[in-house]
A protein has these predicted regions:
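Hydrophobic alpha-helical transmembrane segments in multi-pass membrane proteins
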Residues: 7-12, 180-347, 361, 411-486, ...
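Membrane-interface helix/helix-cap signal primarily in integral membrane proteins
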Residues: 13-194, 527-531, 540, 588-611, ...
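Aromatic-rich juxtamembrane segments at the membrane interface
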Residues: 117-250, 256, 543-545, 617-618, ...
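Core dinuclear metal-dependent hydrolase active-site scaffold
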Residues: 279, 283-287, 402-425, 429-543, ...
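Alpha-helical transmembrane segments of multi-pass integral membrane proteins
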Residues: 298-406, 698-703
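Metallo-beta-lactamase
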Residues: 541-552, 580, 676-680
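Active-site HxH/HxHxD metal-binding segment of metal-dependent hydrolases
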Residues: 551-596, 600, 697
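Cap/insert and terminal regions of metallo-dependent hydrolase folds
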Residues: 574, 658-735
């Protein structure tokens, strides 16, 4: 058997994957009451500065009142005062503060903080924390490493401009808490955010450099190897020991061990051993995107090196490396971020070689900046200037790449079976090359076939796949995984807290949004609406309807329109508003933003309609010439018809608007409604008994936030809906609510409780 150790480790990883699939981890429950003040005792295992706070991570935690052991670590947020070294690393402390759990995702595509911190083994946070007692013993080594890191961060702050300092601290010291947000978003959008990860490039450059320096000093090889690995382990501990750093240090140690034992170093075996050791400590790391991307990059470089390799033009080797990494990263990126930066592999042809120069300049900056100013000032500023030039060049390249056509490919999250087929194609290409796709008595001497070489017996040789077949297979796999066809009509009521946002997709793939804002969630556009749209593969909205201009209906849309960095990158073709809109400050700002982006604004009134992809929107309110001083009263009310199913979308309309809409429906001979979006988040001053009696809605959707200060939905509204026999669904209870419409029937699917109900 070739690579027996690698096979054992891979078998372990596969076993872990199967086990996790068959036994998914239950959603963590907060063992202490949310918002309660508690006193905890635990050991300080990590600490770092985040803005004006000291974040301390405690392990082996127990609570005094109520007395219980905490399953997992706790993040404590302390005020960063003059005594920034308290508490010391490795010490046992008692700390008091307010309990805060991690929120779970409530919409498709939304970041799941609860699941993320569950993988990291963190149970909850403690805000407004204060150390009330500290043991005398502590870890001198860990505390020393922390002080070194703080000192080096100070060097960057003194020598570099704030923006450059924040980026260099992230690249060399793993300090991402103060990272410039604009640079972070730009690099992420361009596909070069990997420069912020402490990984193989850092360990290879620093570790091998240090090892070769020791060898030049005639120090015995075993001692050089042990010291070099020890220094890299200390560096990893200092920068936070992420999964990518842990992987790189383990592989570095195995590489030096192979040299000492005079054995051949095998990258794939080292990678498999590193994966097994990490998963033995925490199996759920297998679902961590950082783990997947870090190991995937090395897997692509190692496994696919012979499959995708320029035979004649060696100068194309860097490009072939980017293509190999793309083949492994592509499904991971789509499953995690739902989009792919098309020009990232070209950017990395420049960025990765330049990173060695940037890191070298950063090290000189740190070294010289740590010396007395008389000696180190000039070299530190010179190196700092080089860092600035390189970072400015990176930003310029990223900005230019994002302005190119098709810069960002929004695909959406692929179906699991599509990901499996893509991976199967890549594995088959590897197996076909490694073991031969078939046996031939005599391998062809010319043509496109690649001969593996040694005969297996009686002249038989393994023959690889033709290059054209490889290309066709990869192209077919990429096409398959990037397809995201519409499957009938879908209507999703997003959970935006106290607000409204409705996404509608036609059977033909047209995309519409009705409202998009919240008064209880900040940055709703960035963190909820845009991730949801990209999860569904939406890069362009055919129309956005704003029922009225209250912030809880437009704040997220305004974010998208104000997005100058193009990080949200959702194109809006047209904006539709109520003809009775109040032309106040929000209206003027909206008009200005739309003019800047060249988005036409249409004012709708009763009788107007729009048809697209089998959908029909009909405006029922406001009527022509309707005037009001109330934004809520000016709300658009629309009837949506799709494949024999009808829905009424009401905004925050008030009683007189409901009456006018009801009269129009009655005049048209309309019998009843299937889906009713409750007006004004379930307010008792809307959703009148007369309207509900006329509509007789089969299903009512109420969009409101948990524990909102308005008391929505009001008990009177719920009682009225129950009297009409409506099934009531609330986003505060179920998260996003999706209605799938097919041939006159519809099913209701909820995001949190994962329930499914079929209607009509």
């Amino acid at each position: 058997m070739r690579r027996p150790l690698c096979c054992v480790c891979v078998a372990f990883v596969v076993t872990v994957f199967i086990y996790l699939q068959m036994n998914p981890a239950p959603a963590p429950t907060l063992c202490l009451e949310e918002g309660s003040n508690v006193t905890l005792q635990g050991k300080v295992v990590q600490k770092y500065v985040q803005k004006d706070e000291l974040v301390v991570q405690l392990d082996h935690v127990s609570a005094s009142q109520p007395k219980q052991k905490i399953d997992g670590r706790v993040l404590c947020y302390l005020e960063l005062g003059e005594r920034g070294d308290v508490p010391k690393a490795g010490s046992v402390i008692a700390v008091a503060g307010k309990v805060s759990g991690f929120g779970r995702a409530r919409n498709p595509g939304e970041f799941d903080a609860q699941g993320y911190y569950q993988i990291l083994g963190v149970a909850f946070r403690l805000y407004k924390a204060e150390v009330i007692a500290q043991g005398s013993s502590y870890s001198g080594c860990r505390e020393y490493l922390y002080q070194i890191r703080r000192s080096l961060e100070g060097v960057f702050d003194r020598v570099l401009a704030p923006k450059d300092a924040s980026v260099m601290k992230a690249i060399l010291l793993g300090s991402k808490s103060g990272l410039d947000e604009e640079s972070k978003q730009l690099f992420q959008k361009s596909g070069i955010a990997h420069i912020f990860a402490i990984s193989g490039l850092h360990i290879t450059m620093l570790g091998m450099g240090f090892y070769h320096i020791l060898r030049k000093l005639w120090i015995p090889q075993p001692l050089c190897a042990v010291v070099s690995v020890g220094v890299m382990a200390a560096y990893g501990e200092m920068v936070g020991m992420s999964s990518s750093a842990y992987r790189a240090i383990l592989m570095f140690g195995l590489q030096l061990a192979a040299q000492m034992l005079r054995r051949t170093y095998d990258m794939l075996t080292a990678l498999a051993v590193a994966a097994m050791l990490i998963l033995m400590e925490e199996p759920r790391y297998l679902y961590h995107s950082g783990f997947q991307l870090s190991f995937g990059a090395i897997l692509g470089i190692g496994c696919l090196s012979e499959i995708i390799k320029p035979v004649r033009w060696k100068f194309l080797e860097p490009l072939s490396v980017s293509v190999r990494i793309f083949l492994v990263h592509f499904p991971i990126m789509l499953a995690t971020y739902y989009e792919f930066p098309v020009y990232s592999f070209l950017l990395n042809l420049v960025i990765i070689p330049a990173m060695s120069v940037l890191m070298a300049a950063g090290l000189v900056c740190l070294g010289a900046g740590s010396l007395p100013a008389v000696i180190g000032s000039v070299p530190a500023k010179t190196a700092g200037g080089l860092c600035h030039l390189l970072l400015a060049g990176f930003e310029r390249l990223c900005t230019v790449s994002l302005r190119l056509p098709f810069a960002n490919w929004v695909v959406g999250r692929p179906d699991t079976w599509r990901i499996c087929v893509f991976c199967a194609v890549v594995v088959y290409l590897y197996a076909a090359h490694q073991y031969g796709v078939f046996l031939s008595a005599r391998a062809p001497e010319r043509g496109l076939y690649h001969t593996k070489g040694a005969a297996r017996g009686q002249g038989e040789q393994t023959v690889g796949l033709p290059a054209v077949i490889k290309f066709a297979a990869v192209l077919a796999a990429v096409t398959l995984i990037s397809e995201n066809p519409a499957d009938g009509v879908s209507v999703t009521f997003l959970d935006v807290g106290q607000g409204d946002c409705i996404w509608i997709e036609s059977a033909g793939g047209e995309q519409f949004l009705v409202d998009g804002g919240s008064s209880s969630k900040s940055k709703t556009g960035q963190y909820t609406i845009v991730p949801f749209l990209k999860y569904n593969g939406v890069a362009t909205l055919d129309a956005v309807f704003l029922t009225h201009l209250d912030s809880d209906h437009i704040s997220g849309i305004m974010e998208m329109l104000k997005d100058s960095s193009q990080t949200m990158d959702i194109r809006i073709k047209r904006l539709c508003i109520s003809d009775a809109v109040i032309e106040d400050e929000p209206y003027e700002e909206l008009q200005m933003l739309c003019e800047r982006r060249q988005i036409p604004i249409y004012r709708l009134k009763a009788g107007d309609s729009m048809e697209a992809g089998g959908l029909r929107f009909e405006v029922l309110h406001p009527s022509a010439g309707y005037e009001t001083a109330s934004r809520n009263a000016s709300s658009l009310v629309m009837k949506l018809e799709a494949e024999g199913v009808t829905a009424l979308l009401t905004g925050d309309v008030e009683a007189d608007g409901e009456q006018a809409a009801g009269q129009l429906l009655q005049q048209s001979g309309f019998a009843g409604i299937d889906i009713y979006k409750a007006a004004h988040h379930g307010s008792k001053y809307s959703n009148t008994q007369a309207l509900l009696a006329q509509l007789q809605p089969e299903t009512a959707i109420i969009s409101c936030g948990e524990n909102n200060r308005y008391g929505h939905p009001h008990a009177e509204t719920v009682a009225r809906l129950e009297q009409t026999g409506s099934g009531i669904w609330m986003t505060k209870d179920t998260g996003a609510i999706t209605i799938h419409i097919r041939k006159g029937c519809y099913t209701i699917e909820t995001f949190i409780n994962d329930s499914l109900a079929e209607q009509k």
